[in-house]
Curated annotation (Swiss-Prot):
Residue span, MGS-like domain: 3-153
Family: Belongs to the methylglyoxal synthase family.
EC id: 4.2.3.3
Top-level taxon in the UniProt lineage: Bacteria
GO MF annotation, one: methylglyoxal synthase activity
PANTHER family, per database record: METHYLGLYOXAL SYNTHASE
Annotated catalysed reactions: dihydroxyacetone phosphate = methylglyoxal + phosphate
Organism encoding this protein: Hahella chejuensis (strain KCTC 2396)
This protein's name: Methylglyoxal synthase
HAMAP family the record matches: Methylglyoxal_synth
GO cellular component, one term: cytosol
InterPro entries noted in UniProt: Methylgl_synth, Methylglyoxal_synth_AS, MGS-like_dom, MGS-like_dom_sf
An annotated GO BP: methylglyoxal biosynthetic process
NCBIfam families: MGSA, PRK05234.1
Length: 153
C-alpha cells in the first residue's frame, strides 16, 4: 500500500492552521506543547503563524494567510512530503469564503496519509502518542493510478 519514507523516526514537521475564532485555542495548545513543537519544523498560515511566533516563541515558517492561498501552500507541502502532522482548528460554526481551499487541504492530508487533528483533544492524542517519537510516514503508492488507461487516449 505505501512506501516508507527514508528518514529518521519521529514527527519532524507540523503544520498549524486556525480560523479566527479558534486562534486563541490553537495558541493555548501550542503553549502547552511547545517543547515538542520546538523540535519540529513548524509551518503555519500567515496570521496564525504570526500570532503563534509572537505569543509562544515557537519558530514558525509562515505561508500566506489562509484565504490568500496559505491553505493551498500547506497542501502543496503535504503533497511534497514536507508535513508529517496537520493541526487545523477550524470553526464549524462559521462559513468561510475559502471553503473549497479548506476541503482541498483536508483531502490532500487524507490522500497522503498525514495524521490530522481538528481540535485540541485530537491534537493532544497525536502529540502525546508514543508514535510521535517513532512515527515513520507511509506515503501511498500511486503507481497504478498514474499508469492507468485513460479513456480516449
Amino acid at each position: 500500500m505505501t512506501d516508507q519514507v527514508n528518514r529518521p523516526k519521529g514527527v519532524t514537521s507540523v503544520a498549524l492552521i486556525a480560523h479566527d475564532n479558534k486562534k486563541a485555542d490553537l495558541i493555548a495548545w501550542v503553549e502547552k506543547n511547545s517543547v515538542k513543537l520546538n523540535k519540529c519544523t513548524v509551518y503555519a498560515t500567515g496570521t496564525t503563524g504570526k500570532l503563534i511566533a509572537e505569543k509562544t516563541g515557537v519558530d514558525v515558517k509562515r505561508c500566506h494567510s489562509g484565504p490568500l492561498g496559505g491553505d493551498q501552500q500547506i497542501g502543496a507541502l503535504i503533497s511534497e512530503g514536507k508535513v508529517d502532522l496537520l493541526i487545523f482548528f477550524w470553526d464549524p460554526l462559521e462559513p468561510m469564503p475559502h471553503d473549497p481551499d479548506i476541503k482541498a487541504l483536508l483531502r490532500l492530508a487524507t490522500l497522503w496519509n498525514v495524521p490530522s487533528a481538528c481540535n485540541s483533544a485530537t491534537a493532544d492524542f497525536l502529540v502525546n502518542s508514543n508514535l510521535f517519537e517513532e512515527f515513520l510516514p507511509q506515503r501511498p503508492d500511486f503507481d497504478s493510478y498514474l499508469s492507468r488507461d485513460v479513456p480516449g487516449n
